[in-house]
Amino acid sequence: MRLSRGLYPRFVTLEFDMKTIQTLPRVLSMAAVALASVLLAGPAHAQSCGGDINDDGLVNSGDLATLLSNWGACAVSAPTISQVAPNSGPASGGTVIYIGGTNLNRATSVTVGGVAATVLAAYPTVIVATTPPSATGGAKTVAVTTPGGTASANNAFTYGAATPSWATLLEAAPDPVVVTSASLRAAIAASGFAWRVRDTATQIEMVLVPAGTYTMGCTASNTFGCAAAENPTRQVTITNAFYMGRYEVTQAQWTARMGSNPSNFQSASAQVPLAQVPSRPVETVSWTTVQGFRTATGMRLPTEAEWEYASRAGTTTAFNNGSSDDNTAVNIAWYNANALSQTRPVGGKAANGLGLHDMSGNVWEWVSDWYGAYPAGAQTNPTGPATGTNRVLRSGSWGYSANFMRSSYRGFNTPAFSGIDIGFRVARNP
């Protein structure tokens, strides 16, 4: 609708939408009151001219025209972020941060890693806020939202490595002497979780296995080829980081939870003094019996794919020490060439590239999967066949040759079977 009136010194022509028309009487009334107050106050030259919008020395229809022509929401400039300080803090949150930039004073939301922060103060060029807790550590995006839009600063704030609620921190960052691969250290850091922790309830030490992709299956040694069950090889992706016991579960750890010790090797020997017997791996435990320990502790068995991924620790060779030479198995495993027909205290051989010990030899280790032929093609987080007769065993033991120490070797037995060279290690989600 077009409205023209000649009641003022200047002719005013304006365009209105329906909403403006509905509010026009109130606006005109307010304007009339304002103009009347100006007139009653005396000559134009004596007033402050606070209403002189167009700066012509008069408060009149021209000013009203300017007001009405700009009726509606005011434009708001988009925010920007130039810096965040400090740029790091604990995963527990509570760090006071200063977000510098422009057009920040009308902030409606501030987030760190997608989680709302607590805003303490907001000014045009700086926001003061406290960081929220983070379920994971690592670099996070800081974002500020105003009526003018959202500004984001990628990786602007880094949380320290998070320790799971069930654990006690031992080492946040991987020891480069143990985790020698820079890519593995980077993957552990990127996960946002601490590298080495201790389960508070059981005192079982665990290390983080980061997410990743590897080739699962046959890797022959210089002496031994692969069994048919180790083929076909295929790409396997583990999408989530998980913790794995640094050592096989010991007799002491089992007894503390289950109340009795089923192991065959409960006595001292010429090689194992009495004080070290509790640190021998528990054995003579069936897959079925292990479920009781799992339930009592909140732990789980690793899947077969997780186990091999953790054992390899980035290697593509027969053995997890980066070699395919059978003579090097003696450095990482207790097997028939050096064990003297008995288990040995856990951790006595060199760790692999993640800090895991005895992933070859000492005792066979139950995993969660039913045993079956490998499917062809790439897989993500495989869990094995849905049903079966036997459960998978990995790692070889003190009674077997170097062939069985290879990372890809697969064993199996019925869930009810327990042998004097069969134990396990645990896994747990963060």
Report the location of each language-model feature.
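Bacterial N-terminal signal peptides
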Residues: S29-L39
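Sec/Tat signal peptide C-region and signal peptidase I cleavage site
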Residues: G42-A46
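Surface-exposed, short loops/turns at beta-strand junctions within beta-sandwich domains
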Residues: P133-G138
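Conserved structural position at the C-terminal beta-strand
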Residues: V144-T146
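Active-site microenvironments of metalloenzymes and redox enzymes
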Residues: W166-P176, T213-D325, D369-A373
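Surface-exposed recognition segments
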Residues: N222, C226-V236, T315, S323-D325, ...
